[in-house]
Design a protein with these regions (language model features):
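A metal-dependent hydrolase signature that marks the N-terminal structural subdomain at the beginning
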Residues: 1-44, 177-190
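Active-site recognition of the HExxH zinc-binding catalytic motif
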Residues: 19, 83-96, 120-121, 125
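Surface-exposed patches in mature extracellular/periplasmic domains of secreted proteins
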Residues: 20-36, 102-103, 131-144
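Catalytic zinc-binding patch centered on the HExxH motif and its immediate surroundings
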Residues: 38-65
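Short pre-active-site segment immediately N-terminal to the catalytic Zn-binding motif
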Residues: 68-85, 110-112
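Catalytic Zn2+-binding segment of zinc metalloproteases
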Residues: 89-105, 129-132
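Post-HExxH zinc-binding segment in Zn-dependent metallohydrolases
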Residues: 109-136
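Long, well-structured alpha-helical subdomains associated
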Residues: 129-190
């Protein structure tokens, strides 16, 4: 478990350093995000008590939470760990760019939440492509595709088909704009 925590912390630090110039240019705060670990499947955060393997909380400038169950179940996959870290960091990008505020003005419901979650996953795969810390071989590419299709469709995080579509879109996109889930029809964010 200590090795997984090191991987998480290294991935968060590297990702944050990569985003600092963008945040500075846009006038966003650049402070480091606190990383928290919790036992079981429930995180207690300033945003409330949430049941999830990993959580981003936007309160107080943002913080990341990773559950012990996530670390034990996925301890053999570097790609899985990075996908989770980058997904949660994707929510930080959304919070920084005020997408959380804009979302609050939209009708509540699963589709609005799905657009947010699928966009974070799209960001995550773009960050994986840009991550030079491990080789993106054909084997790793297939592991990534399989990981995207392995999520259980809970109505909020997207169907395996949508996650694969947006995940590959983010992976192959030249810019973060390729992850704009807010301008497509409902059929693209199932």
């Amino acid at each position: 478990m200590a090795e997984m925590k090191q991987q998480i912390e290294a991935a968060v630090e590297c990702t944050h350093k990569a985003w600092i110039p963008v945040f500075k240019q846009l006038g966003y705060p650049t402070h480091s995000l606190p990383i928290n670990y919790y036992e079981g499947g429930t995180a207690t955060t300033p945003c409330g008590t949430l049941q999830a393997p990993a959580v981003y909380c936007s309160a107080n400038g943002g913080s990341l939470y990773f559950g012990s169950r996530l670390l034990r179940e996925n301890s053999t996959s570097v790609i899985w760990i990075k996908l989770m870290v980058f997904h949660e960091y994707g929510h930080h990008i959304q919070a920084q760019s005020k997408l959380f505020n804009a979302k609050a003005k939209l009708p509540s419901g699963n589709e609005t939440e799905r657009r947010m979650e699928i966009q974070a996953e799209c960001y995550a795969t773009g960050m994986i492509r840009s991550d030079d810390s491990f080789a993106l071989t054909e084997k790793n590419y297939q592991v990534l595709r399989k990981a995207l299709q392995s999520f259980i469709d809970d109505g909020i995080h997207g169907s395996p088909e949508s996650l694969l579509y947006w995940g590959m879109r983010g992976f192959h996109s030249e810019s973060i704009g390729g992850c704009n889930t807010w301008v497509v029809g409902s059929e693209k964010v199932r």
